[in-house]
């Protein structure tokens, strides 16, 4: 089995390698290819050395190759994993600072920041998909690249690649509740409804017994993501919502508090992008230590805990045709009746070797349906804008987003973001050649 990691120089790669090494008995991996772009060559070289040490420590006969040749890396792969950041951290910082300059939330996957990241990223992922169609037509593409739902929807609509989008949020809820109730993860059953970074948990069962009231009444806590401020939830709100919101809901349900905090960080030149840049530097300093031959615990500060476990569990299920349940980003196909058939949703799915099938969700109450439909409409328009380069569609997408207060604000943010990202937007600017970075 050949596994190709696009964005192999990512700071997350040791997490992924740890997972693959741990399940080698089930997967039988013969080759791992790490591929990146010239701008990431230094990090790729560091990662190649660390990966080699990890594989040698495990005593496994896995051939490791690091390259800038994406097509060679993709050829005949069984699984392609994408974890790229088009524009590097510099453009993430630009997204945050432009958003906050205009007084709106600046976040990597939500609002104006997620919108701009999607416009930069979708064309590159579709280009990767063309290579997969040609060179590894039977491969599964596991997409971790954010905004994962938007990127996966674009691939579902505009390529023939077998794709599944993944996020580490669902598995973190399983981990949290298994710890809370002191049971194995297999004893926890969760029903998720929504789209990537906008999922609600509508059912929580522990060994078959419903325990969702524990969370809604404050008896037990829910999972709190490391990269999102923790303000807690109002219990009256939770009980009337009748569902457990995910951490990213805070940008919608607690907008004022999060925006106030972000604006203070902006004034101090210390937004999340600045924080991540410092963490990444510390991580790569660690990775260069020739005695390091395992994933350092410091990686958990990066916000990607357990993402490798989600990826490796999915690969083993696909490989073994296990028909077990995973929470994934897939084509709707009627699973959520209030969303379009071709929308990308994040729900529980049955995984077989040849397909991934979403489970029917059933009735979605209006307090969930309202926000879900609006954000999904924004996502539909954003995918269209990314593919066509239509500025009018882009303006409508950004105006529709709940975190953008007016069409005037949307236009001002859009114009500045497009200009700042000109180099990465060949579909919007005909004088720009396509980029793979």
Question: What does each model-found stretch correspond to?
Answer:
Residues 2, 30-31, 63, 140, ...:
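Residues at the starts of beta-strands that form the adenosine-phosphate
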Residues 15-22, 46-55, 129, 174-178:
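Short, well-ordered amphipathic alpha-helices
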């Amino acid at each position: 089995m050949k596994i190709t990691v696009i964005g192999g120089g990512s700071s997350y790669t040791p997490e992924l390698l740890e997972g693959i090494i741990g399940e080698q008995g089930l997967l039988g991996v013969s080759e791992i290819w790490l591929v990146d772009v010239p701008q990431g060559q230094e990090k790729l070289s560091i990662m190649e050395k660390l990966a080699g040490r990890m594989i040698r420590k495990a005593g496994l006969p896995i051939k490791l190759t690091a390259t800038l040749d994406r097509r060679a890396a993709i050829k005949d792969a069984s699984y392609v994993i994408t974890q790229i950041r088009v524009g590097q951290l510099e453009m993430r910082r630009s997204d945050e600072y432009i958003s906050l300059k205009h007084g709106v939330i600046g976040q990597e996957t939500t609002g104006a920041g997620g919108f701009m990241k999607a416009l930069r990223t979708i064309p590159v992922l579709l280009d990767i998909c063309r290579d997969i169609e040609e060179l590894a037509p039977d491969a599964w593409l596991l997409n971790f690249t954010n905004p994962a739902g938007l990127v996966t929807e674009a691939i579902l609509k505009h390529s023939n690649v077998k794709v599944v989008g993944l996020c580490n949020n669902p598995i973190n809820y399983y981990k949290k509740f298994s710890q809370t109730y002191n049971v194995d993860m297999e004893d926890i059953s969760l029903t998720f409804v929504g789209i990537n970074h906008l999922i609600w948990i509508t059912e929580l069962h522990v060994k078959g017994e419903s325990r969702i009231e524990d969370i809604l009444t404050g008896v037990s806590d829910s999972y709190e993501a490391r990269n999102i401020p923790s303000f807690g939830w109002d219990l009256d709100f939770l009980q009337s919502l009748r569902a457990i919101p995910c951490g990213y809901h805070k940008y919608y349900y607690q907008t004022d508090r999060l925006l106030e905090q972000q604006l203070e960080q902006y004034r101090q030149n210390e937004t999340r992008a600045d924080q991540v840049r410092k963490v990444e530097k510390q991580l790569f300093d660690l990775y260069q230590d020739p005695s390091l031959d395992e994933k350092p615990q410091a990686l958990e500060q990066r916000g990607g805990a357990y993402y490798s476990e989600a990826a490796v569990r999915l690969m083993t299920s696909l490989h073994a045709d296990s028909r077990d349940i995973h929470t994934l980003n897939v084509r709707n196909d009627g699973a959520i009746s209030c969303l379009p058939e071709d929308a990308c949703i994040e729900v529980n799915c049955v995984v077989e070797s040849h397909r991934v099938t979403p489970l029917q969700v059933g009735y979605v109450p209006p307090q969930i349906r309202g926000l879900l439909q609006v954000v999904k409409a924004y996502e539909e328009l954003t995918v269209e804008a990314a593919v066509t380069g239509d500025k009018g569609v882009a303006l409508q997408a950004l105006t529709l987003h709940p975190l953008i207060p007016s069409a005037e604000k949307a236009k001002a943010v859009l114009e500045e973001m497009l200009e700042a990202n000109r180099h990465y937007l060949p579909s919007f600017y005909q004088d720009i050649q396509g980029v793979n970075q």
